């Protein structure tokens, strides 16, 4: 997910996306531990998406204050 797309989402949508990505990250780590994960690059993609969302959430919070 690109930063531009993330910025267009509302705060509630961002929180929902963050939760969704965290669940996906959990499942990917579980697959990696059991040796079933084929696309290991997806782990870093999901982690970076979570970081992008958290960054934009904190920016929005600072704008409000």
From Swiss-Prot:
One of its GO terms (molecular function) is structural constituent of ribosome. InterPro entries: Ribosomal_protein_uL29, Ribosomal_uL29, Ribosomal_uL29_CS, Ribosomal_uL29_sf. Keywords: Ribonucleoprotein, Ribosomal protein. The keyword Transcription does not apply. Gene3D superfamilies: 1.10.287.310. Pfam families: Ribosomal_L29. CDD domains: Ribosomal_L29_HIP. GO terms for cellular component: cytosolic large ribosomal subunit. One of its GO terms (biological process) is translation. Belongs to the universal ribosomal protein uL29 family. This is Large ribosomal subunit protein uL29. It comes from Lactobacillus delbrueckii subsp. bulgaricus (strain ATCC 11842 / DSM 20081 / BCRC 10696 / JCM 1002 / NBRC 13953 / NCIMB 11778 / NCTC 12712 / WDCM 00102 / Lb 14).
């Amino acid at each position: 997910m690109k930063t531009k797309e993330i910025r267009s989402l509302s705060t509630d949508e961002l929180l929902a996306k963050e939760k969704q990505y965290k669940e996906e990250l959990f499942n990917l780590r579980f697959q990696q531990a059991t040796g079933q994960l084929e696309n290991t690059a997806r782990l870093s993609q999901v982690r970076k998406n979570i970081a992008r969302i958290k960054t934009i959430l904190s920016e929005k919070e600072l704008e409000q204050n």
